[in-house]
């Protein structure tokens, strides 16, 4: 059955307008993006098939062009549209944390750091630099590693902090395995960084580890 023949309150577009985007399933949101189905398959059915094929919405959105375009009902035009949507989402989050803004929402910081690091195939260590009123100065990616480790050097972190005259920092790194639980090495290097920055009177407000689920906060664990 075509979606236009469904009851109005069950159609994805109308449902979004009436109840908001959060009320829609992954398949319904994807169907709105797809707009149309293929022969013998409406947009909702196509969306469900794609989610089953890729395993998750995140896997579909993160697919490389060749893999994406091999899927039934998708092609280069849809890939371009999708990349544009994803980039707009990243820029929205970046604007929310643009230079000069105070950090008033811990959840926004989590979302921003997730967007920057979660799907990286290799480990990346980065930090948010803040002034003495906790306004954002800069987001810096500092160290890049292998699939399971990145070498981190406290001296280079200190140099970066001094260069930008930061008064506080938020550290972050990803675990490409998807498991966000901090390792013993993560805790050890964080202690070394805190000790180094304490010598120049700069505070480490938090250290987030990014994985598949919610980021793990060192501050919430009482480790800072």
Swiss-Prot record:
Pfam families (alphabetical): RadC, UPF0758_N
Binding site for Zn(2+): 173, 175, 186
Span(s) of short sequence motif JAMM motif: 173-186
A GO BP entry: proteolysis
GO molecular function: metal ion binding; metallopeptidase activity
Keyword Zinc appears in the UniProt entry: yes
Top-level taxon in the UniProt lineage: Bacteria
Annotated CDD domains: MPN_DUF2466
Keywords: Hydrolase, Metal-binding, Metalloprotease, Protease, Zinc
Protein name: UPF0758 protein Tola_0183
Lineage: Bacteria, Pseudomonadati, Pseudomonadota, Gammaproteobacteria, Aeromonadales
Source organism of this protein record: Tolumonas auensis (strain DSM 9187 / NBRC 110442 / TA 4)
UniProt family annotation: Belongs to the UPF0758 family.
Residue ranges annotated for the MPN domain, each copy included: 102-224
């Amino acid at each position: 059955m075509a979606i236009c023949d469904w009851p109005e309150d069950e159609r994805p577009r109308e449902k979004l307008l009436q109840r908001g985007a959060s009320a829609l399933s992954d398949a319904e949101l994807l169907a709105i993006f797809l707009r149309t189905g293929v022969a013998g398959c409406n947009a909702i059915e196509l969306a469900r098939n794609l989610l089953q094929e890729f395993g998750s919405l995140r896997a579909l959105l993160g697919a490389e062009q060749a893999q994406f375009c091999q899927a039934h009902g998708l092609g280069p035009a849809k890939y371009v549209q999708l990349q544009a949507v994803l980039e707009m989402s990243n820029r929205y989050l970046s604007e929310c944390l643009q230079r000069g803004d105070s950090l008033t929402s811990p959840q926004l910081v989590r979302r921003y750091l997730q967007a920057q690091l979660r799907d990286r195939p290799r480990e990346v260590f980065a930090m948010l630099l803040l002034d003495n009123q906790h306004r954002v100065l800069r987001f810096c990616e500092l160290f890049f590693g292998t699939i399971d480790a990145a070498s981190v050097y406290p001296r280079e972190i200190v140099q970066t902090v001094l260069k930008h005259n930061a008064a506080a920092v938020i550290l972050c790194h990803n675990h490409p395995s998807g498991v966000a639980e901090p390792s013993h090495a993560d805790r050890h290097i964080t202690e070394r960084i805190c000790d180094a920055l304490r010598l120049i009177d700069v505070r480490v407000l938090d250290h987030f580890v990014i994985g598949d689920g919610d980021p793990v906060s060192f501050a919430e664990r009482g480790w800072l």
